[in-house]
Amino acid sequence: MPEPAEYIAHLTDAHTHLASCGARDAATVAEFVTRAHAAGVERICTVGDGLAEAELALAAAESHPDVVAACAIHPTKARELDDAARARLREMAAHPKCVAIGETGLDTYWIRHRPDETAPLAVQEEALRFHIDVAVAAGKALMIHNREADADLLRVLGDAPSPKYTILHCFSSPTAVAKEAIARGYVLSFAGNVTFKNNEELRQIAAMVPIDQLLIETDAPFMTPVPYRGAKNEPAFIGHTALCVAAARSMPVAKLAEAVAANFDRVYQIAKP
């Protein structure tokens, strides 16, 4: 069973899937948050990857003061984006606890590996443009999923209207893409894969990102960090990723956590009590 890292104050999880972790009601959401609190995690953004899970993400955010939500339809499921789904997502975007529109984006990996189950790239692109428009209209951050679609993603983001913040979640692209994203002012969010042994380039990217363009996430129940790679992930385990990123940046993890928490609050427009 994975264990949290040492207690680190002021941690935040910029992208997790509480419903996929098993937290599908208020009581179970509270259990996950309690475990996260014990590891130093103060705030969590839970994400929907389809309309049903977006509803659960918003319900989780409504049920707990330390949870906020991101709502969208995942690019692989973009064929679900019918008129009713579009109308509902616009409603969700206006909710005060929906802090980002996501995850949306482009994914060619699953087009190649599961073409019958995955929306074609043209459908994904149209859905992405819809979500961008929703984010701009609502004044919310845009949360991007990108899997092996760097050039097309940069093209779409470059010619579409610009949301206040664009987050590249679970950043995994090459250094050249990172440099372009940084130059455009995007926020790069790093998940547990930054801890993987063979991901030295990703650690170098985490080291070069300006501190005010950096978030950390679990992407739970996926992307469990070393030393528990392959096990089921949850927000309580984000400290392992924070320690890795702090080491890559040669800075104390406490300072990293404070800076990333400030970014979380700014990008997601979290009102101070």
What do the PLM-derived regions correspond to, one by one?
Residues 1-273:
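Mid-domain alpha/beta scaffold segments of enzyme catalytic cores
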